[in-house]
Amino acid sequence: MQEVASASTHELTSQGLHEFKRLLIQARTEQSAIETELITAQKAERQAVQTYDRWRNGWLFKRVRKQRFQQLQEAAQLTTDVRAELEEQQSQARLSTQIEMPDAARSAFLRMSDAFAALKNASRIWDTVQERSTNRVAERTMAHRTVMRKPVRFDLGRCEVIEADWQAPHLGNANGGDLYLYPGFILYFVSTDAFSLLDLSEVEITYDPVRFHETEAVPTDSKTVDRTWAKVNKDGSPDRRFKDNYEIPVVLYGQLSLRSTTGMREEYLVSNAEAAEEFVAAWAAFIKAARSGE
């Protein structure tokens, strides 16, 4: 079978977004270094404050050893100041992502997010990870294509490499990086060290209705549109030579395909075909509004 997957993160990033990616990596590197120092500083602060508090709450030592008590107080304050300074540095190291959009584009993006919110509630969503063409005669089937699929989740969320105020549509990926749909770009995220940024103009998201021969339980939000058999004749009738031949429901699913000129290739099956179609229509409306600049 042939894998259905995107190219590596080194290849996917759009030409015009390489500098933005570099800044994100730089900011993340600085944050990681500060986080390491901050953990050490927080531990030192806890120890210093606990020691000072024991002396302060006691009666004898702070009166008998006044100089030592003063030193403990100063040490506790110093560790608190160091921790606060590192937290400030951590905040400043974050690269805030603010994308200015015309009112029409912003409204279209919000409508697309609403459509995605409905899509994510589909009973089942699968990532198509492998495919092959069927030999319809040898396999005695009416299906043109055989796929391997794995269940994934869609949700609205945030990715740790992007500092933004909004939640972006998030598409899980069973054999590659997760996808986040932001107003100005698509983020393909494997890890904080491996991610790509794709310009919206280079990505195409399409919808196709798929008649799927479902051998598992039929999702509650799907429509059964036909019936077939495990083994069939050329005319679609059941092949009576097979004693244990059984009936298979043909279910209407929505197929989402994401392609880019830089090598993105992702494909999903959604049990709620109507929600999938409405999402892609809302996405197309957003792209049109974003390109018009109105």
Can you describe what each PLM-predicted range is?
Residues 1-294:
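A composition-biased, non-transmembrane "mature-region" signal
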